[in-house]
Amino acid sequence: MKYLVLLAGCGLGDGSCIEEVILTYAALDKYGCDYTPVAENVSMQSVNHLTEQIAEKRNILIEAARIGRGRIKDIHEVDFAEYDALIIPGGIGLLNNYRDSHVIKTCVTHFISEKKPVAAMCAGIDFLRRFYGSNL
């Protein structure tokens, strides 16, 4: 199986939760799974993690590359049909950065409409509810 791992930057407050991403990678590696981390190539507000105040804008794809293991791809360049399942680690960045993203909604909709597995953690579950309400 090929897995798509959706990242929203790097850091719990304005991106993907690093611990959840690393544990996802560890589990996929343990079982020899093929996976591709993806993020959208857009700039969004970031958070100063020392003060929790809004900071400068940062590019989500570039930030996600910090934990992308050299495999990170722009989600606009990915053919969702080539993947068997979607994994969404948590992090507040999902809720903030991808609130109005057409390509992210298209991605999630593809996996759900094709009845492919979608796994979400923590804020990833709330993220899915924004698109699909309680119909999950």
Where do the PLM segments sit?
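Short, thiol/selenol-centered motifs that function as redox-active sites or metal-ligating centers
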Residues: 121-122
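Conserved, well-structured core segments that form or line functional sites
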Residues: 115-118
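Extended, subdomain-level signal for the structured scaffold at the beginning of enzyme domains
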Residues: 1-113, 126-136
